[in-house]
Amino acid sequence: MYKLAAIVGPTAVGKTNISLEVARQINGEIISCDSMQLYRGMNIGTAKASKEEQNIVAHHLIDIADPHENFTVARYQSLVKDLISTINARGKIPILVGGTGLYYQSVVDDYTFFPMEVRQSIRDKWNAIIQEKGLPHVYRLLEQIDPAYAQIISPNDQKRVVRALEVYELTGKAFSTLQDRAENTYYLAVVGLYLERRELYARIERRVDEMIKKGLIEEVAALREKGIDLSYNSMQALGYKQVFYFLEGFINREELLNEIKRETRRYAKRQLTWFKKDQRIKWFNVGDFSDEELLVKNICTFMEGQFGIV
C-alpha cells in the first residue's frame, strides 16, 4: 500500500509554512488540496506558496488550469491518485496540503464518480426545481435527507446543495455517510491544524489586509479584462467574488474589506466543522507550541510513527 500524509485545517492557520518544513524533514512532496490554487493567475487571493517556496520542496497541482475551466473534483482525484503512486515510487511521501474538504475526502475515502451524462440529467432536474420553487425549498429537502451535510454548507450554496441531492439519487445514501474508507488503499497520516477562534480570526483580518496591499484588486481586474466573470467556478473563490462586486461599483472599499473578512471567517468555521468529523485526523493547536520548530517536530514524530519510519 502507498503512504499518504495530509495537513489540513482552516484558512490562515499556517498550513503552508508548516507543510514546507514537514515535507523537507520527512522527504515529502506537497500536493495542493485547494480547489482554487489550481487556477493560473489567481495567486494573491488563494495564498499560493511562492515560487521560492515551491523551489524548496516539490509542489503539485498548482497553476494547472485556466480560470475559465470548470475543474471538477473527479478530475482532481484522478490526478492525485497518479501523483500518489509516482511520488511513492520515487521513495518519497506525498503530502496533501489544504483546506478544501471535498477534495481531501475524495482522495482519502476513494469516492466513486458516476458518468457525467447521468449526473448531468439529475443535476438539471434539481436546478429546474430550484428555478421553479426556489433554493430554500430544495435546501429544506436536503435537510431532511442529509441533515449532517446541510449543517456544514451554506443554504445559498446551490452547487453543493444540488451535488448532495445528486449523490443521494445515485447511491441511495446521504453524502455525509459515504465513508468508504481508504485504509485498504493507503497508509494514512493526517494532521489537522487549528487555533483558538480569536487568534484565527485575527490572522484572517491581517491576511485580508495584506492581500489587498499586495494587489488582490488589481489581480481580479486583470482577470476581468480577460473576460473572466462570476459565471466561472474560479470566481467563486473567497475574495474574488467580492472584488468583482467592488469593481462593478456595487460596494465601496470599506464594504469590500468587511465582506471578505466576514465570508472568510464563515468559511473557516465550515472548514473546521467538515474536518472535525474525520476521526483519523490528529489535531494540533498551533497556539500550544512556543515556536514553529517544535510544532513541526511533533508533527513529524506523529507521521513517522504512523508510517513506521525509524
UniProtKB/Swiss-Prot annotation:
Family listed: Belongs to the IPP transferase family.
Catalytic activity: adenosine(37) in tRNA + dimethylallyl diphosphate = N(6)-dimethylallyladenosine(37) in tRNA + diphosphate
Residues of the site described as Interaction with substrate tRNA: 100, 123
Record-given protein name: tRNA dimethylallyltransferase
InterPro entries: Dimethylallyltransferase (IPR039657), IPT (IPR018022), P-loop_NTPase (IPR027417)
Gene3D superfamilies in the cross-refs: 1.10.20.140, P-loop containing nucleotide triphosphate hydrolases (3.40.50.300)
GO BP terms in the entry: tRNA modification
Alphabetical keyword list: ATP-binding, Magnesium, Nucleotide-binding, Transferase, tRNA processing
Cofactor(s), names only, from the UniProt record: Mg(2+)
Gene from which this protein is expressed: miaA
Binding site for substrate: 11-16
HAMAP family xref list: IPP_trans (MF_00185)
Region (Interaction with substrate tRNA): 34-37
Binding-site residues, ATP: 9-16
Subunit field text: Monomer.
GO molecular function per UniProt: ATP binding; tRNA dimethylallyltransferase activity
Known EC number: 2.5.1.75
Cited PANTHER family: TRNA DIMETHYLALLYLTRANSFERASE
Record's function text: Catalyzes the transfer of a dimethylallyl group onto the adenine at position 37 in tRNAs that read codons beginning with uridine, leading to the formation of N6-(dimethylallyl)adenosine (i(6)A).
Organism: Syntrophomonas wolfei subsp. wolfei (strain DSM 2245B / Goettingen)
Coiled-coil annotated residue ranges, if any: none
Keyword match Ubl conjugation: no
